[in-house]
Amino acid sequence: DELNPALSTYGLPLGDAFQMRDDVLGAFGDTAITGKPVGDDLREGKPTPLMAIATARANALQLKELQLVGNQDLTPAQIARVQEVIRETGALDELETVITRLTDEAIAAVQHVPFAQSVRDELITLAEYVSWRTV
């Protein structure tokens, strides 16, 4: 019973960090590494924290360019421009900061779980992989 809160304190932020990393990879991932077409999530118009931040911070011209998101026929040039707008708005940097914070929260939670140090080390390794994965 005492493990449930500690493991939840580890797992919940790590799950959020995993999903946010997936959102970044869906918008910026390298096809050769991820196996998914570049900008696939942009073509699909998936509502993600990355797009929410970019949209909230975008100026009028950038908003117009972000309206391309969800168009299945986005060209590589249009995808590159949307990616540029996401970077310009600071959305990518902000999401990276949030991923780091959530990962740090998960790692800190592991320190309080009554497991052998080797198990804690494995959980920390998992957290670091999840947050910085490229696939």
Language-model regions, residue ranges each:
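All-alpha prenyltransferase/terpene-synthase fold signal
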Residues: 1-135
